[in-house]
Regions:
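Duplex nucleic acid-engaging cores and interfaces of nucleic-acid transaction enzymes
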Residues: 1-145
């Protein structure tokens, strides 16, 4: 199944960042599980704000490309924006390869365990910047985290 069809716009928001990288953000707890556990491939990068509710975010690694630090920071900033830390200044965001994201049996939707975490500190983008990165198929802008 190709990723174009696996990312239902009702379940995730899609962005494109410089370098042609695609970034997906889950909309609800159940959508976060879908993005993190069904859409994600092992080499993708996974992001979530540390200790604060928010979206699970994926930086899609197409054709085994390696994102540079700037791409990782931009995806982390998208995770910061889609969290309750949106207005919190400098935000710590956990980042790891999707292969290190697992779900324990019986845990609630949106709850995952991660290994091999890297923490990036980023400022959430302004809403105008988020609109510029938004992919056309998902143009209906939603202000909720």
């Amino acid at each position: 199944m190709n990723r174009e069809k696996r990312c239902d716009p009702r379940r995730c928001i899609e962005y494109e960042i410089p370098g042609g990288w695609r970034v997906l953000a889950g909309k609800t707890d159940a959508d976060n599980d879908f993005v993190s556990l069904k859409v994600a491939k092992p080499r993708d990068w996974w992001f979530h704000v540390r200790g604060i509710p928010g979206s699970h975010v994926l930086l899609l690694a197409e054709h085994d490309q390696e994102p540079d630090r700037e791409a990782l920071k931009r995806a982390a900033a998208i995770a910061a924006y889609h969290s309750k830390a949106r207005t919190g200044g400098l935000v710590p965001v956990s980042c790891t390869r999707a292969q290190y994201v697992t779900k324990a049996r019986g845990t609630k939707a949106g709850s995952v365990q991660i290994r091999k975490e890297i923490v990036l500190k980023v400022h959430p983008p302004a809403p105008e910047q988020m609109m510029e990165m938004r992919v056309a198929a998902n143009q209906q802008f939603d202000e909720s985290p």
